[in-house]
Amino acid sequence: MPSETAQAGEGPAGCPHLSGAQGSDRSLDQRPPGNKDAPERVWIRPDVPSRCTWELGRPVADSPHQHAALAKSPKILPDILQKIGDTPMVRINKIGKNFGLKCELLAKCEFFNAGGSVKDRISLRMIEDAERAGTLRPGDTIIEPTSGNTGIGLALAAAVKGYRCIIVMPEKMSLEKVDVLRALGAEIVRTPTNARFDSPESHVGVAWRLKQEIPNSHILDQYRNASNPLAHYDTTAEEILQQCDGKLDMLVASAGTGGTITGIARKLKEKCPGCQIIGVDPEGSILAEPEELNQTEVTAYEVEGIGYDFIPTVLDRTVVDRWFKSTDKEAFAFARMLIAQEGLLCGGSAGSAVAVAVKAAQELQEGQRCVVILPDSVRNYMSKFLSDRWMLQKGFLEEEELSVKRPWWWHLRVQELSLSVPLTVLPGVTCSDTIDILRGKGFDQAPVVDETGEILGMVTLGNMLSSLLAGKVQPSDQVCKVLYKQFKQIRLTDTLGALSHILEMDHFALVVHEQIQYGGDEQPSKRQTVFGVVTAMDLLHFVASRGQDQQ
């Protein structure tokens, strides 16, 4: 995969995508937007324009990168890193038939990699390329902003090779990923899920700050590192071609950093030019083309490892023939289907890919073949989409789909509860005063609203006290600095059963009421106001007091 010759002082593995932090001004965003007085911030954006010079038809001999041929594995592997790659291709039998496909539907099962995901390939490739370039040396520290799977791959390789590993990941990522990372010896830093990628508080921003503070540390940077798509160009794509004897008519892959679909697609365009490349992007992400596909009211999504709010440098959208958007609901439904009907223990993003595959492959005929990439394992999501409770709480599963006998109160509405007048706090109130107010009123939490009543977030005693003790805030700081935004909302018309599912995982739920607001000639807008805060104790009190009347 040809690329410009690396320049002196460039990033890991001599990658032409990576101009060093002291290099091109185009890669530097030294101060947060609109704040010229802020301290200088040194980082490299994950969406800088690509400098890769790969062209269809250009000889691989012109490439500055090292390309190794696929090798047969020995009977006894020298270490677990040799079990990365050579993943099986499995025929999907029932799902394709049930959705009326005429073509053959095959799954490339990347969860058979040593660390459980397709990201093991790029993790090992980035490290080995950096070692060959002399960038990464014994005793150095690897830092990486990641949704979890790349982190697991890097932590696995770091454990075997002896590097210190620090993984920076958003809060929405599953606890299972965190537990696996800790078991592998990685240090973990969590960042707010809703932080924009270019914010200093994002997983990207925090990783670059740590790099400035820790000597001999490196961000291999999957978003810009040419080793990312190269891993798939040299191995994943070659395996697919060998397993299919060079015959495939469509490839479907979801996109996160874009390295998987870019690397595979470039090789297939060279060796199997008639193969259609189908990209999968979740609703709420902006990777798909044309841009109209990305227009949605969805601002967040639960499926992990795919989609972004920026276009990563390594994503080459010119090699994708068509994009499809996927929803959380269909992603998790298809992931469960793959497990239940095909015995494939895959993750949610695999469900996204297969949901799109059964749509895109409708045009294929008998004798044609569609290959879909299943990126990771269900291991990382045992407490998420594998759980009926989680699926019900998120609205991805209906009560009617579960044949379980429910208690007498299950279908009653939240409005049946005796909710007290809500206590709210303005964002300018200090942490010290807020603690006094909550303790004085006997509350553990309160909504933070602005002057118009719009909900900004929640503040909890536990969150405030831990932030104060950790030195993140001072007692005199405004409470808006410790807003808690990972809370659940429920409406008065929702059932107590739905509330029960929330309270099994959370200490409270915010009861909200929707209003339609008109502002003169402007279009009406929906806004939410606080009706109350409900806790498990409120529900238990209601059940106990009304239960006697039911007997």
UniProtKB/Swiss-Prot annotation:
One GO CC term on file: cytoplasm
Activity regulation annotation text: Allosterically activated by S-adenosyl-methionine/AdoMet. Activated by S-adenosylhomocysteine/AdoHcy. Binds non-covalently to a heme group that may control the redox sensitivity of the enzyme.
Record PROSITE patterns: CBS (PS51371), CYS_SYNTHASE (PS00901)
Catalytic activity: L-homocysteine + L-serine = L,L-cystathionine + H2O
Ranges where the record places region Disordered: 1-41
Source taxon at top rank: Eukaryota
Binding site for pyridoxal 5'-phosphate: N149, G256, T257, G258, G259, T260, S349
Co-factor requirement: pyridoxal 5'-phosphate
Residue positions where N6-(pyridoxal phosphate)lysine is found in the record: K119
Domain CBS positions: 418-476
Any GO molecular function: cystathionine beta-synthase activity
Glycyl lysine isopeptide (Lys-Gly) (interchain with G-Cter in SUMO) crosslink location in chain: K211
Modified residues (Phosphoserine): S27, S199
Stated family: Belongs to the cysteine synthase/cystathionine beta-synthase family.
Function: Hydro-lyase catalyzing the first step of the transsulfuration pathway, where the hydroxyl group of L-serine is displaced by L-homocysteine in a beta-replacement reaction to form L-cystathionine, the precursor of L-cysteine. This catabolic route allows the elimination of L-methionine and the toxic metabolite L-homocysteine. Also involved in the production of hydrogen sulfide, a gasotransmitter with signaling and cytoprotective effects on neurons.
Record text on subunit structure and interactions: Homotetramer.
Name recorded for this polypeptide: Cystathionine beta-synthase
Gene name as annotated: CBS
